[in-house]
Amino acid sequence: MSKISVVYWSQSGNTAAMAEAVAKGVTDAGKEAEIVFVSSASIDELKSETAFALGCPAMGVEVLEEGEMEPFVTELEGCVAGKTIGLFGSYGWGDGEWMRDWVDRMTVAGATVVGGEGVICQDAPDDDAKTACEELGKKLAAV
């Protein structure tokens, strides 16, 4: 059975809850999901996967978390060409600029972002956001 990694960073638990929902979608579609906090994630493992998910909330002035997730994404940019990636995350304020920027970065690096956009929600994911995350997982599993 092929595996789909769901790599995320979360401070409040909101993006972690979204990661759980993405993984549920993957397993509901018949594939194995591995949820990994970014500090334990391996770029080499992601290189061997056709599809994977990345999650991070908006931080500061709508940017990725700068201590762990941003350096990970920067390193990953060099090896995402030809990969299918699902992006997700929560925010407290703003309009989703951090996600649009992230989608653009991955697209320019040669990845296909599922649906052409990330799944976002304000604060804790409600039922609609959880459903959207599950659908993201199912789409990744279909790759």
Predicted regions and their residues:
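FMN-binding flavodoxin-like domain, especially the glycine-rich phosphate-binding loop
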Residues: 3-4, 14-17, 21-38, 48-143
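Aromatic-flanked redox-active Cys/Sec active sites in thiol-based oxidoreductases
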Residues: 8-12
